[in-house]
């Protein structure tokens, strides 16, 4: 029999209560024993959100693009969840939270939920718990979930496993063409975005 706390938490998530969502995400990230039961209870309410993975090299402008996409989806009347996977601070073990600073314009918008996560040393561009965090946002009824990875390297292509659409952000001048197409990341993209297109290298 589930405890009242558990039932209230599940009910809160299904009603898109930000506090309940944040609490569940913290339990998931901290590998709390209750996390498994939470995800099991939420599972029947998942599978409706469109998950867009945004990946690319460090400094390519992923956060800015995610911010603009969120603005556009909100303009269309859709609710948005944003999961920004940040590098882990070597001192605190937590997320550096650089991405949330860039997305501050959404803080007062009840239709946008933003969560930063630390990789906690996990290779692959995604936190171990990222897919489970997506389930919470999905169950909460978010129409669109934007998943921004850590600036990835050649082998860090986990985003394709959890995203419905993979969006790769490229910047002119960052490595020659051969290097780019050797990289595994070029093989996973459904959409390629050439950012900072006003750079002289574009020509």
Predicted regions and their residues:
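P-loop (Walker A) phosphate-binding loop of NTP-binding proteins
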Residues: 57
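Conserved SF2 helicase motif VI
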Residues: 182
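Conserved beta-strand/loop subsegment of P-loop NTPase cores
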Residues: 165-170, 185-198
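GTPase G-domain guanine-specificity segment
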Residues: 94-98, 197-203
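Hydrophobic positions on the alpha1 helix immediately C-terminal to the Walker A/P-loop
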Residues: 65
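Nucleotide-state-sensitive switch-loop elements of NTP-binding domains
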Residues: 8-52, 60, 69-155, 162-177
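Aromatic (phenylalanine/tyrosine) cluster motif
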Residues: 2-6
């Amino acid at each position: 029999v589930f405890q009242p706390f558990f039932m209230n938490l599940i009910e809160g998530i299904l009603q898109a209560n930000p506090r309940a969502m944040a609490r569940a995400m913290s339990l998931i990230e901290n590998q709390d024993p209750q996390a498994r039961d939470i995800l099991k209870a939420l599972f029947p309410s998942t599978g409706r959100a469109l998950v867009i993975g945004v990946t690319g090299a460090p400094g390519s402008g992923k956060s800015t693009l995610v911010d603009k996409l969120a603005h556009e989806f909100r303009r269309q009347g859709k609710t948005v969840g944003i999961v920004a996977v940040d590098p882990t601070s070597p001192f605190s073990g937590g997320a550096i939270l650089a991405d949330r600073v860039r997305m501050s314009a959404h803080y007062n918008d009840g239709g946008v939920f933003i969560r930063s996560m630390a990789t906690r040393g996990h290779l692959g561009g995604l936190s171990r718990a990222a897919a489970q965090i997506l389930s919470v946002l999905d169950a909460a009824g978010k129409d669109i979930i934007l998943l921004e990875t850590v600036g990835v390297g050649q082998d860090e292509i986990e985003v394709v496993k959890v995203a419905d659409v993979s969006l790769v952000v490229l910047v002119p001048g960052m490595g020659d063409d051969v290097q780019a197409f050797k990289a595994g990341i070029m093989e996973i993209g459904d959409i390629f975005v050439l950012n900072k297109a006003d750079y002289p290298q574009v020509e």
